[in-house]
Amino acid sequence: MTQVTVKELAQEVEAPVERLLQQMREAGLPHTDAGQVVTDNEKQTLLTHLKSSHKSKAEEPRKITLQRKTTSTLRVAGSKSISVEVRKKKVFVQRSPEEIQAEQKRELDERRAAENAARDKVEAEVRQRNEEQARRQAADSAVAAPAPAAKPEPAPAAAPAPVVADAPASEDAAARAAERKKDETRRNESRTRDDDRRRGEAPRVSIKVKVKEKEKAPTPRAAPRTTDEESDGARRGRGGKGKLKKRNQHGFQNPTGPVIRDVTIGETITVSELANQMSVKGAEVVKFMFKMGTPVTINQVLDQETAQLIAEELGHKVTLVSDTALEDSLAESLKFEGQTESRAPVVTVMGHVDHGKTSLLDYIRRAKVAAGEAGGITQHIGAYHVETDRGMVTFLDTPGHAAFTQMRARGAKATDIVILVVAADDGVMPQTREAVQHAKAAGVPLVVAVNKIDKPGADLDRIRNELSVEGVTSEDWGGDTPFVKVSAKMGTGVDELLEAVLLQAEILELTATPTAPGRGVVVESRLDKGRGPVATILVQDGTLRQGDMVLCGSNYGRVRAMLDENGKPVKEAGPSIPVEILGLDGTPEAGDELSVVADEKKAREVALFRQGKYREVKLARAHAGKLENIFETMGQEEKKTLNIVLKTDVRGSLEALQGSLGGLGNDEVQVRVIGGGVGGITESDANLALASNAVLFGFNVRADAGARKIVEQEGLDMRYYNVIYDIIEDVKKALTGMLGSDVRENILGVAEVRDVFRSPKFGAIAGCMVIEGTVYRNRPIRVLRDDVVIFEGELESLRRFKDDASEVRSGMECGIGVKSYNDVKVGDKIEVFEKVQVARTL
């Protein structure tokens, strides 16, 4: 509750402030001012004082009676049953404080008396044991000593004298020892009594025997049998071992307080693992999370902060550990030592689609790549290195289509210089602006190539203006970005462009260590039918050699072969050289870093660790979407979903298509890529599409014989594409068809009521003038009075000059009979309309 002041409390109880302060002083409260704060405890104290002062103290019940009734059924012979009702009654009486104190005092006195009695009993037993021991020693000495007739006295008097003298001293010492070790004495009490009984009885028998047979020498007494906890007697439970059985029981006791445990939490941890570390049931952790407002399951992955909060709330000590220890050890092992040398620049060509990026590269490489690409547009990242008169340059050609945003961002990260290609006749377009943003984010310099300068509509000043808005200012205008006019078709300005690029490279002073182990980045990856996983690698530092063990993201393997961009095998690749490598165990993600490691064991260990981490992150993301939106989606209509199984030729195209298709849809329809991969369409893909009612899409890949057979037998929808535009358009059409249609109303005509007639057949007939549109027979109508709809029905009769008419046009008079409606008045308007179904669009 919130705290209030004395003044606010006086207003609530409707009493003067002075009177309330007087009552608070009488109750012993320290308040003297109306602005002081009154706590809940002080309110309770004041209330108790007021009740006692008015002699209205609430009497608490001193006796509570609980009655419990249990009904059960007892079956008897003959399929009969008897209802048995058991009633129990318990009475709880509240005792006064005086009675409680008296009972506590009585219990304390009884406990002290019991302790004194136990102590006296122990002392008496010790005293008795010492006396018996003294008697036995006297008897033994009397039997062992000779008894001549001349001297009868010394024999009996020699032995007992020291025993009797030592008895009080040993008795006192034993008593003191017993007081110091009460617990040990009580624990060994039964065992000592049994030993004494055996030791006391055996010598008596031997004395009688030895007195009768004085000729025989006395035999030494056998050592008393010990009752060890581990002995067979204790285990088998022979006679007299009742107390020992109790000792042999385990000593576990329930903990009196909460057990605080040390919980070690990594970057992620599942609910079940966290519960195991805290030694509680998983259901308790789930229940605790529900109370915090977060629904979870026992297998859900929690992040480090959430797990730490749960463990600390439950009272345990938390130790946070980093899961990157393995990655850190790998980074330490990858040392780059050696002489640094200058390396060739890595240049990425970016720009809008159809602005001539690949054509410009074709002219530089003296190749014809653009002509061989589907639709004349680039859909992969291409990596090439070119020997020019001024040195070697490595080019990365990126797609310009909007779907390939991730590819362009990846190209900007792996590059040193960006060539921004802008068509002189088209100007700055959306992907041009995006390329500028990627270059700025990566912190790499720009060189603007104004292409298609030979076209009639070329306007260089317009491009400079538009790019200056994006923060790219030409050197001619006082900026730091070179603008070069080129024509990829004619070859104009290409030499000047290369010169500008190499000038930027000299300013950057790019260096590498060729003698170090290779390190690079994955530009693209695909699954080749004959060669397996193939990855395009751009070596950034060191030298990659055939036979090296490489770690690439969550994949690893030994480089079995290396090919350059022309498909020729090479043995090694230095800095800034793009190569294709074979030998990985899977297709790595584009953008993953590649490192040469020392041994296969280390590579496998790190790869498996990364795979597990990726799986945990994926599961956490999936669970977050499922459970957090449970209550939001409750009661809403379920979305219609178009399921797609997508197979592409390279990993980059798969990423681009998944991003583009996932962005389609609205609140009613959505696209879900339930299966995706690199390579041809296999039989398992067809079975997945069959089980999930999905459509099979192949992008630059084909289906094998097994998949085609399943598609034909089951009538699945399978389509092949080689241009990204086509697949996006087809999916849009499919989603539009799933939306259904909207019903739209078109007003056909409006008639105004001028007079009302009565007909024995139709009832009220409205004499109308058509003032707008055309009135049709057997169409739905609305009756409007003062422009407010008062009736909606159907036009039953339409006549003109006593003849039935199918339609009456504007400006003509007619008689209208409304079905099941007779309240037509002069001045009403009759609106005739029709309902039309209209196809919906995204």
Curated annotation (Swiss-Prot):
Residues 487-489 are annotated as: G5. Residues 236-249 have a biased composition (Basic residues). Residues 451-454 are annotated as: G4. Residues 342-509 form the tr-type G domain. Residues 376-380 are annotated as: G2. InterPro entries: DNA-bd_dom_put_sf, EF-G-like_DII, IF2_assoc_dom_bac, IF2_II, IF2_N, P-loop_NTPase, Small_GTP-bd, T_Tr_GTP-bd_dom. It is found in: Cytoplasm. Residues 149-159 have a biased composition (Pro residues). One of its GO terms (molecular function) is translation initiation factor activity. Pfam families: EF-G_D2, GTP_EFTU, IF-2, IF2_assoc, IF2_N. GTP binds at residues 351-358, 397-401, 451-454. Coiled coil: none annotated. Residues 96-138, 173-202, 226-235 have a biased composition (Basic and acidic residues). Keywords: Cytoplasm, GTP-binding, Initiation factor, Nucleotide-binding, Protein biosynthesis. Residues 351-358 are annotated as: G1. Residues 397-400 are annotated as: G3. Residues 94-259 are annotated as: Disordered. Belongs to the TRAFAC class translation factor GTPase superfamily. Classic translation factor GTPase family. IF-2 subfamily. HAMAP family: IF_2_B. One of the essential components for the initiation of protein synthesis. Protects formylmethionyl-tRNA from spontaneous hydrolysis and promotes its binding to the 30S ribosomal subunits. Also involved in the hydrolysis of GTP during the formation of the 70S ribosomal complex. This is Translation initiation factor IF-2. It comes from Pseudomonas putida (strain GB-1).
